Amino acid sequence: MQNLVSNRRKSKRIYVGNVPIGDGAPIAVQSMTNTQTTNVIATVNQIKALERLGADIVRVSVPTLHAAEQFKLIKEQVDVPLVADIHFDYRIALKVAKYGVNCLRINPGNIGNKKRIRSVVDCARDHHIPIRIGINAGSLEKDLQNKYSKPTPEVLLESALRQIDILDRLNFDQFKVSVKASDVLLAVRSYRLLASQIDQPLHIGITEAGGARSGAVKSAIGIGLLLSEGIGDTLRVSLASDPIEEVKVAFDILKSLRIRTRGINFIACPTCSRQEFDVIGTVKELEQRLEDIVTPMDISIIGCIVNGLGEALMSNIGVTGGPRNSSFYEDGIRQHHRFDNKFIIDQLEARIRAKAMMLEENNKITVINLPKK
């Protein structure tokens, strides 16, 4: 089945660490730590947890020079590329560049005078570090606030182009741009305007989207709209929640649009009085148990025969509820074995894990060592 994205926007290619960004590269998932950066152990543990779930890039706030020293210790203990989030003090950018940061998230306009901006850009150039220009509707320049009275797509665009012009004048093109807002329509319209004006990679997201539920909904709509139009090269789902949830929602959005698949896509009915087993409890438990599986798979769990067969025929593994025991399908073929409804969770987990192992084995590339001439 084809994805919903047509004519993905063409952009320049940059690299954040070893992760390619733009120019047709896979859309990268990013999250951000919410620990105190000076708490090295907690920050490292959170970064590693995000990486295990599939985060391609992790952003870390570095608000002080002391935090920059701790960033060095953090960088030494993780493998995933790190973005340092820096504002106001240009010296922090110079310091983390020496410590191996993979990207600087700054606004050139709030780093200081032209000499300081040049110092940061020259440092980034010397260390082959890209920059992300991050425009946010909540922190626009005062003169633009006075000019427009309220955030609009036009003011976010003007702010972005102002920052981009600074880098252009310094002959620096290794950067990506974001124009975020907490209002979904404002963010979407701003990104559309920006995408029509520049060919740099775009980092997309709905900033300060809210809690786990409402934030996920806003992000799915906003990010989904942009991705469906071919706009976006990296993304972050910003939630007032555990950053782990950000990565989960991000991959759910990408899976829903069939842009990038990772892990299990659960297809489950909302249940009614026809269900023959506890569908909701089964899905909830399996989602937790099978978080470690990265193999793309479609798993249908339907409580009765009304839609169960149709979904099972299109799934890697499907179960259709029946009285006392349920029908089991693999790759659309009904199996002789049936699941006892009392033990359906354990039985499904075993079958799904076995299927994942088989798919992984089939997808392995056989390396043939040719004899040396």
From Swiss-Prot:
Pathway assignment: Isoprenoid biosynthesis; isopentenyl diphosphate biosynthesis via DXP pathway; isopentenyl diphosphate from 1-deoxy-D-xylulose 5-phosphate: step 5/6
Catalytic reaction equation(s): (2E)-4-hydroxy-3-methylbut-2-enyl diphosphate + oxidized [flavodoxin] + H2O + 2 H(+) = 2-C-methyl-D-erythritol 2,4-cyclic diphosphate + reduced [flavodoxin]
GO biological process: isopentenyl diphosphate biosynthetic process, methylerythritol 4-phosphate pathway; terpenoid biosynthetic process
Enzymatic class: oxidoreductase
GO terms of molecular function: 4 iron, 4 sulfur cluster binding; 4-hydroxy-3-methylbut-2-en-1-yl diphosphate synthase activity (ferredoxin); 4-hydroxy-3-methylbut-2-enyl-diphosphate synthase activity (flavodoxin); iron ion binding
EC number, UniProt record: 1.17.7.3
Record carries keyword 4Fe-4S: yes
InterPro entries: Dihydropteroate_synth-like_sf (IPR011005), IspG_bac (IPR016425), IspG_bac-typ (IPR004588), NO2/SO3_Rdtase_4Fe4S_sf (IPR045854)
Domain of life: Bacteria
Cofactor(s), names only, from the UniProt record: [4Fe-4S] cluster
Keyword Iron applies: yes
Keywords noted in UniProt: 4Fe-4S, Iron, Iron-sulfur, Isoprene biosynthesis, Metal-binding, Oxidoreductase
Cofactor notes: Binds 1 [4Fe-4S] cluster.
Binding site for [4Fe-4S] cluster: 269, 272, 304, 311
SS bonds (residue pairs): none
Sequence similarity: Belongs to the IspG family.
Described purpose of this protein according to its UniProt entry: Converts 2C-methyl-D-erythritol 2,4-cyclodiphosphate (ME-2,4cPP) into 1-hydroxy-2-methyl-2-(E)-butenyl 4-diphosphate.
Protein name: 4-hydroxy-3-methylbut-2-en-1-yl diphosphate synthase (flavodoxin)
Lineage, opening ranks: Bacteria, Pseudomonadati, Pseudomonadota, Gammaproteobacteria, Candidatus Palibaumannia
Gene that encodes it: ispG
